[in-house]
């Protein structure tokens, strides 16, 4: 028997953040904002200079995090954010920097 599936108002955000976002505290800042919003997931540096952010929780909180990522008030400088949406992964806990 499996547990209940994700609630309808829950979502999983996958955001690819382009710009000068490595070595400037961007992942730490993202983690702090995600935890304030009650989200789980991770922020990971990629070899090409992007940061991959995966966050899940309420759709509203994920949308707020996406808005913050695009706000211009992050560490470093964000040129663009490409976002994709999916069903949440029930096994994800906490929010980590990778």
UniProtKB/Swiss-Prot annotation:
EC number(s): the record gives 3.6.1.7
Q: Does the keyword Flavoprotein apply?
A: no
Active site: residue positions: 27, 45
Positions of the Acylphosphatase-like domain: 12-98
Give the catalysed reaction(s), semicolon-separated.
an acyl phosphate + H2O = a carboxylate + phosphate + H(+)
Extract the GO molecular function terms from the UniProt entry: acylphosphatase activity
For the protein in the UniProt heading, the enzyme class is hydrolase
| Name assigned to this protein | Acylphosphatase
């Amino acid at each position: 028997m499996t547990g209940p599936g994700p609630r309808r108002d829950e979502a999983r955000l996958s955001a690819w953040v382009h710009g000068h976002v490595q070595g400037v505290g961007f992942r730490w800042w993202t983690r702090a904002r995600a935890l304030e919003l009650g989200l789980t997931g991770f922020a990971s540096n990629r070899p090409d200079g992007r940061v991959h952010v995966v966050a899940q929780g309420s759709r509203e909180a994920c949308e707020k995090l996406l808005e913050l990522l695009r706000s211009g008030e992050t560490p470093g400088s964000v040129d663009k954010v490409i976002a994709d949406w999916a069903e949440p992964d029930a096994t994800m806990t906490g929010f980590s920097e990778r």
